């Protein structure tokens, strides 16, 4: 890891980025105190280092302020990293760690050591004995980072727990009992809800057993697993705190009364949805994206043949089932938004698994709400899961607002600084790179259709591949990664494909992606949590070349992919390819203008690069709409909780379906 250890070399860049000179002066003073301890600690043996760490814990638990313990704690953490991992925290990482301790979100570029930086505030907050959590986007990254940093923490006498989806209650309790716990936002949220449900059940039972002399739970396995929410460091903070903010985490309660009728109606709607035509039978609201049947559409529903079970369903409900099914047929596509695979519970039964657009990974255990998931199951002919009510619910946004101490790290937060500060009260600071970036942006290319765009991409891959430089091509969906892979096969270009269907090979593919002559086609899986290292001879011939095949709903996601090249000051280049049938145009300008652009594209031969600005304008429109949605969510959740508390309800358990 090549980093500068001279703080003065980075001071100007940092101060300019944050524009907070007084705060920066104070951080530099703390850095100087950390540096002053380095030679002393290097002269001490491992046992003395551990004793120092134990003494710090006693002082913290006795009430001494963590800000006063910070210099020694960070110096100890740096020395433990040097000895156990051969990785020394450089000065900019120490500064980043100070910012994290003070509740900031730090923007650190790929390869600049976010995982190592995270150990600093995690260790410091763990000293008070209330637990420190690190939340990341998936189980793989949680396990990888925890195991990677574990020798450092063990040298300091600090225990580490890892939460994985398959863990049982006992395993989770043990992991939360550790000083530091790595896991995902989803698992932290579900454990919070399960504990809350359990506490309610215990309170009711204890009330019923009052006077019996038997506590009822002391020897039971039914015990809460979390021990509170003190500090959370959010990795990939923009993805979790912004992109996933509206995602509700729901524990369902099974309804048996009308199961057969509901399942039969889903099948009936899926069978008949393709018969309905846009404008004639249904309309789509450009703002809300809501599907609504026209008078002719409702008339068609009434005329459709129905089984006895479906016939007993209310007419308004039938309309909603058809509208929902039309939406899933048009907008939810196999190998884009979801995949079909054998169920983990029963390999003989297929199931629908969501593909997370922001990470490109399978969203294990997550289901779409409002009947969308069941409608897709009916469309694909797989077993329809039992519709559920809500036993408990919390949004990702609300989950992290419960932590009294919150901080985050990401490679792309500056563009969302205002939103993060407004919702989470977490200012954003940009940590400077240790070497000047050498990433080159090549002019964007615009084509009429997806086909002509992909043919041009394949040609560019062929040209770059001939030079020996590694190439990474990012796609928005699984089906497009497969399509591009076929084009490369036709050209005889050996390559790897990384998407949610072969996640088990992720580590192997990523490890080789920076090698000479390597070509990798990947979904967003390659955009977050991956650090593609170049082989020794690649830097001399220009480094990695990244191709973005279309714009995402947020510019931050595009920047994540671009950040795979030019890591740690290495050379690299990237280019964006766009076409007039890209989804971002539909999201930004609406269905009517999108169809006009699409027809224009079909009549266009060659490239129309002058239209590139139109795509970025559409992206900004989508970003603004999503921002408004998140603001509305925050206000709605705040008002709902306030009202429920006023009438004596639990805002997380007494939730409307």
Swiss-Prot record:
Pfam assignment, any one: SecA_DEAD
Main location: membrane
Reactions catalysed according to its record: ATP + H2O + cellular proteinSide 1 = ADP + phosphate + cellular proteinSide 2
PANTHER family documented for this protein: CHLOROPLAST PROTEIN-TRANSPORTING ATPASE, SECA INNER MEMBRANE COMPONENT OF SEC PROTEIN SECRETION SYSTEM
Function: Part of the Sec protein translocase complex. Interacts with the SecYEG preprotein conducting channel. Has a central role in coupling the hydrolysis of ATP to the transfer of proteins into and across the cell membrane, serving as an ATP-driven molecular motor driving the stepwise translocation of polypeptide chains across the membrane.
Membrane-topology annotation of the record: Peripheral membrane protein
Subcellular location: Cell inner membrane; Cytoplasm
Protein name as annotated: Protein translocase subunit SecA 2
Organism: Rhodopirellula baltica (strain DSM 10527 / NCIMB 13988 / SH1)
Gene Ontology, cellular component aspect: cell envelope Sec protein transport complex; cytoplasm; plasma membrane
């Amino acid at each position: 890891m090549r980093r500068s250890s001279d703080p003065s070399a980075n001071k100007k860049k940092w101060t300019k980025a944050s524009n907070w000179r007084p705060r920066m002066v104070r951080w530099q003073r703390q850095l100087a105190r950390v540096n002053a301890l380095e030679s002393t600690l290097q002269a001490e043996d491992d046992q003395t280092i551990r004793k120092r760490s134990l003494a710090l814990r006693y002082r913290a638990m006795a009430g001494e302020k963590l800000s006063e313990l910070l210099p020694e704690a960070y110096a100890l953490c740096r020395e433990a990293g040097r000895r156990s991992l051969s990785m020394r925290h450089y000065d900019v990482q120490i500064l980043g760690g100070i910012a994290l301790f003070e509740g900031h979100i730090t923007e650190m570029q790929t390869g600049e050591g976010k995982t190592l930086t995270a150990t600093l505030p995690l260790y410091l907050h763990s000293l008070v004995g209330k637990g420190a959590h690190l939340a990341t986007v998936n189980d793989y990254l949680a396990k990888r980072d925890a195991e990677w940093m574990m020798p450092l923490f063990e040298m300091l006498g600090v225990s580490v727990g890892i939460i994985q989806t398959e863990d049982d209650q006992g395993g989770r309790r043990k992991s939360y009992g550790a000083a530091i716990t790595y896991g995902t936002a989803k698992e932290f949220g579900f454990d919070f809800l399960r504990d809350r449900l359990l506490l309610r059940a215990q309170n009711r039972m204890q009330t019923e057993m009052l006077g019996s002399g038997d506590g009822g739970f002391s020897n039971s396995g039914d015990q809460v697993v979390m021990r509170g929410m003190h500090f959370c460091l959010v990795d990939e903070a923009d993805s979790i705190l912004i992109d996933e903010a509206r995602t509700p985490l729901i524990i369902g309660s099974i309804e048996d009364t009308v199961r057969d009728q509901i399942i039969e109606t889903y099948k009936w709607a899926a069978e008949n949805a393709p018969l309905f035509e846009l404008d004639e039978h249904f309309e789509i609201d450009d703002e809300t994206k809501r599907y609504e049947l026209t008078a002719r559409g409702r008339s068609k529903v009434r005329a459709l043949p129905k089984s006895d079970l479906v016939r007993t369903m209310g007419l308004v409900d039938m309309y909603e089932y058809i509208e929902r099914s039309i939406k899933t047929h048009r907008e939810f596509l196999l190998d884009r938004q979801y995949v079909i695979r054998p169920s983990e519970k029963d390999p003989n039964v297929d199931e629908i698994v969501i593909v997370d657009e922001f990470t490109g990974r399978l969203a294990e255990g997550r289901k779409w709400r409002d009947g969308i998931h069941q409608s897709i199951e009916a469309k694909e002919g797989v077993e329809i899961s039992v519709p559920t009510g809500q036993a408990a619910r919390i949004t990702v946004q609300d989950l992290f607002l419960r932590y009294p101490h919150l901080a985050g790290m990401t490679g792309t937060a500056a563009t969302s600084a205002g939103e993060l500060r407004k919702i989470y009260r977490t200012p954003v600071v940009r940590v400077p790179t240790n070497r000047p970036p050498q990433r080159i942006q090549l002019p964007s290319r615009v084509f009429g259709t997806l086909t002509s765009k992909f043919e041009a991409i394949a040609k560019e891959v062929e040209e770059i591949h001939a030079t020996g430089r590694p190439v990474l091509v990012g796609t928005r969906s699984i089906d497009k990664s497969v399509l591009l892979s076929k084009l490369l096969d036709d050209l005889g270009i050996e390559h790897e494909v990384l998407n949610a269907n072969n996640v088990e090979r992720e580590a192997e593919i990523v490890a080789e992606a920076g090698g000479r002559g390597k070509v990798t086609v990947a979904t967003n899986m390659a955009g977050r949590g991956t650090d593609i290292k170049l082989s020794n001879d690649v830097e001399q011939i220009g480094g990695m070349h990244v191709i973005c095949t279309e714009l995402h709903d947020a510019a931050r996601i595009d920047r994540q992919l671009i950040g795979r090249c030019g890591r740690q000051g290495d050379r690299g280049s990237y280019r964006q390819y766009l076409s007039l049938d890209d989804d971002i145009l539909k999201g930004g300008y609406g269905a009517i203008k999108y169809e006009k652009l699409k027809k224009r594209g079909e009549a266009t031969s060659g490239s129309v690069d002058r239209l590139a600005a139109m795509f970025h304008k559409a992206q900004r429109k989508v970003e603004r709409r999503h921002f408004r949605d998140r603001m509305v969510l925050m206000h709605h959740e705040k008002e709902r909780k306030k009202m429920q508390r006023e009438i004596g309800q639990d805002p997380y358990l007494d939730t409307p379906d």
